[in-house]
């Protein structure tokens, strides 16, 4: 018998059980099960950060988990079921509990991995496929045979300087440019100082890999890189033409943004190359990034820089019900 409960506060045991579930799903599926945003809310104490936590238990064991966030008019969720308890109605039970909480507003559910099982669950419950987030990759050695270094040198305008982010100094300027650059992005453009501070407190945060482009002291753009100690998605779907990832660290183009004053100048491409060269120079063999499938301009840029599809996450949407 599966029981469902909303957690109004998280204790160490809750977090350990959810983390163990996510680890089991990652081993089975080759992906993390939920996003970084959700993982950052798994902290002891009263539930906060705009995220609610739902667990499914079989006896005392946590066999399913859902995180619910979003806005008052557009809710967003992520859910995962333990590999040993799939095809037993746990996923459907979680979805129905989300319906009960979110109705009548619309609900988006992210599936990490573009799988037939996720698509079937979505279709059975009235969801439409709405958004695809691609994971692209490339090696940091040459991707062209015979070319020992196919990362071009970045072309930086003479009046633009590149420097590293300074904690305690650059947060407000960065948030302003980030909001401008991602004004139409459903997640990135809504970052707050708390969101930024949370990343600054993570073990992976390294300001030396967080590049800012300035003109006369004004921030024009940025490239924030990240290093994963272990590849978060080492296996790839058979439908892609990319080799499987390798155990060990991998770099990430975490986020690249350009202010409207510098749009169309090539600064975004230059900053991307600056970050790729940094990741290569610190000894990483490959790099990944996430980009919306319908962001044709960005996909073209990354394709020109040697990136290829490795995996995909899919958002399914159930419209508001009157």
Curated annotation (Swiss-Prot):
Q: Where does 1D-myo-inositol 2-(L-cysteinylamino)-2-deoxy-alpha-D-glucopyranoside bind?
A: 36, 187, 226, 252, 290
Name the Gene Ontology biological process terms: mycothiol biosynthetic process
Could you say which protein family the record assigns here?
A: Belongs to the acetyltransferase family. MshD subfamily.
Catalytic activity reported: 1D-myo-inositol 2-(L-cysteinylamino)-2-deoxy-alpha-D-glucopyranoside + acetyl-CoA = mycothiol + CoA + H(+)
Q: What UniProt keywords are attached to this protein's entry? A: Acyltransferase, Repeat, Transferase
User: Which positions make up the signal peptide?
Assistant: none
Function as written in the Swiss-Prot or TrEMBL entry: Catalyzes the transfer of acetyl from acetyl-CoA to desacetylmycothiol (Cys-GlcN-Ins) to form mycothiol.
User: What CDD domains is this protein classified in?
Assistant: NAT_SF
Start and end of every N-acetyltransferase domain?
Answer: 5-150, 160-322
Positions of acetyl-CoA 2 binding: 256-258, 295-300
Species assigned in the record: Parafrankia sp. (strain EAN1pec)
A single Gene Ontology MF term assigned here is:
mycothiol synthase activity
Which residues bind acetyl-CoA 1 per the record? 79-81, 87-92
Taxonomy-wise, where does this protein's organism fall, top ranks first?
Answer: Bacteria, Bacillati, Actinomycetota, Actinomycetes, Frankiales
Q: Does the keyword Zinc-finger apply?
A: no
Q: What is this protein called?
A: Mycothiol acetyltransferase
Q: What class of enzyme is it?
A: transferase
Q: What is its EC number?
A: 2.3.1.189
Q: Which proteins does it associate with, and in what oligomeric form?
A: Monomer.
